[in-house]
Amino acid sequence: MKEVDNLDSIKEEWVCETGPPDNQPLNDNPQKDCEYFVDSLFEEAEKAGAKCLSPTEQKKQVDVNIKLWKNGFTVNDDFRSYSDGASQQFLNSIKKGELPSELQGVFDKDEVDVKVEDKKNEVCMSTKPVFQPFSGQGHRLGSATPRIVSKAKSIEVDNKSTLSAVSLNNLEPITRIQIWLANGERTVQRFNISHRVSHIKDFIEKYQGTQRSPPFALATALPFLRFLDETLTLEEADLQNAVIIQRLQKTAEPFRKL
């Protein structure tokens, strides 16, 4: 089986080109090079210790959706270039059957279900903030905390409507915020960029209603974990089209100096 030792051979941002090992020349067909790269990633993930799971063995977990396109890849609809250094480290971890470091600790003791879709024959035109449930074959990667990498087939989009609980000003810029709740549920809501982080927190409390969770804080998920100042606007906090995580506080008692 041919191996891809690293992702440094990806030269261009908008074309997936990863050549064969041993300094062999690139295929004249960029599409074939892209297919080779994506297929190798799945092969290396399985080689790292994956085992096949039947549908009855798979448990419901927190989902992280990764799609490998011809011109880049998306992580929960966040588009990334193959040529970016951080992207190469991210994909190298996936190839080794490991959870990328930027996702570690984000979901706090939850088992993360990383789903990888092969879309190497398609170009990602834009990100769509909709949840896409998984259907296909799963592979559990060997590690202390179970991880999932799965090659999905064609899937149906979950058309669950979001709660319209936020008053919008159509004369101001509007952005979509993806919100991962502590129970693993995901929702998408529109906000003006002049809204504050506290408005997102208010929306979550209304969304959860009678099933309101214990005290929580909000944090970003990508590219790294960062707790958010609730007094900042979405524009000031650079949260346009961002992914937000609900983090439960371990105690209802406020932080205090010892």
Swiss-Prot record:
One of its GO terms (cellular component) is nucleus. Residues 168-258 are annotated as: Required for interaction with VCP. Acts to repress the ubiquitination and subsequent endoplasmic reticulum-associated degradation of CHRNA3 by the STUB1-VCP-UBXN2A complex in cortical neurons. Also acts to promote the translocation of CHRNA3 to the plasma membrane and subsequently increases plasma membrane acetylcholine-gated ion-channel activation. Plays a role in the inhibition of STUB1-mediated TP53 degradation, via its interaction with HSPA9 which acts to inhibit TP53 binding to HSPA9. Positively mediates the ubiquitination and proteosomal degradation of RICTOR, may thereby act as a negative regulator of the mTORC2 pathway. InterPro entries: NSFL1C_SEP_dom_sf (IPR036241), SEP_domain (IPR012989), Ubiquitin-like_domsf (IPR029071), UBX_dom (IPR001012). It comes from the Eukaryota. It holds the Pfam family SEP. Keywords: Cell projection, Cytoplasm, Endoplasmic reticulum, Golgi apparatus, Nucleus, Ubl conjugation. Residues 1-152 are annotated as: Required for interaction with CHRNA3. Residues 61-125 form the SEP domain. One of its GO terms (biological process) is autophagosome assembly. The keyword Cell membrane does not apply. It is found in: Golgi apparatus; Endoplasmic reticulum; Perikaryon; Cell projection, Dendrite. The lineage of its organism: Eukaryota, Metazoa, Chordata, Craniata, Vertebrata. PROSITE patterns: SEP, UBX. This is UBX domain-containing protein 2A. Residues 170-247 form the UBX domain. It comes from Rattus norvegicus (Rat). Part of a complex composed of STUB1/CHIP, VCP/p97, CHRNA3, and UBXN2A that modulates the ubiquitination and endoplasmic reticulum-associated degradation (ERAD) of CHRNA3. Within the complex UBXN2A acts as a scaffold protein required for the interaction of CHRNA3 with VCP/p97, this interaction also inhibits CHRNA3 ubiquitination by STUB1/CHIP and subsequently ERAD. Interacts (via SEP domain) with CHRNA3 and interacts (via UBX domain) with VCP/P97; these interactions are required for the interaction of CHRNA3 with the STUB1-VCP-UBXN2A complex.
